[in-house]
Amino acid sequence: MEENMNFITLTEPAARQIKILKSNFDNEVCLRIGVKQGGCSGMSYSMNFESVSSLRETDEVLMLDSFLVACDPKSLLYLYGLSLDYSSELIGGGFQFSNPNASQTCGCGKSFSG
């Protein structure tokens, strides 16, 4: 498990929402951020909580106030420098990704092409 403090940045609203969501879990969990095939533009973002014991040696890990953010090496190629924000607006709310590596994004903001 390697540490890289710059692979992703979180705004204060995003960090606050992640802490709220994390509080729903009893065990020690981290937030895994990655990419998967699919979505309007070819790739889509994935975010889920998983047990800290599931972290792999090859994962990049970012330690924040009270939680870990993990990313696998293949996803990191597409996500390095990602900024994650959160909005509670009824229309267009939720987590919002700002990815400097995306050559094209779709209107929903949840998928991109590299």
Curated annotation (Swiss-Prot):
Which residues are noted in the entry as Fe cation-binding?
Answer: 40, 106, 108
Which InterPro entries does the UniProt entry name for this protein? FeS_biogenesis, FeS_cluster_insertion, FeS_cluster_insertion_CS, HesB-like_dom_sf, ISCA_plant_cyanobact
Write the record's keywords in alphabetical order, separated by commas: Chloroplast, Iron, Metal-binding, Plastid
Q: Which PROSITE patterns match?
A: HESB
- Name any Gene Ontology BP term: iron-sulfur cluster assembly
Q: Which GO terms describe its cellular component?
A: chloroplast stroma
Say yes or no: keyword Iron present: yes
Location in or out of the cell: Plastid, Chloroplast
Any one GO molecular function term = protein-macromolecule adaptor activity
Q: Which superkingdom, per the lineage? A: Eukaryota
The record's listing under SUPFAM superfamilies reads:
HesB-like domain
- Gene3D superfamilies reported for this sequence: HesB-like domain
Belongs to which family?
Belongs to the HesB/IscA family. Ycf83 subfamily.
| Protein name as catalogued | Uncharacterized protein ycf83
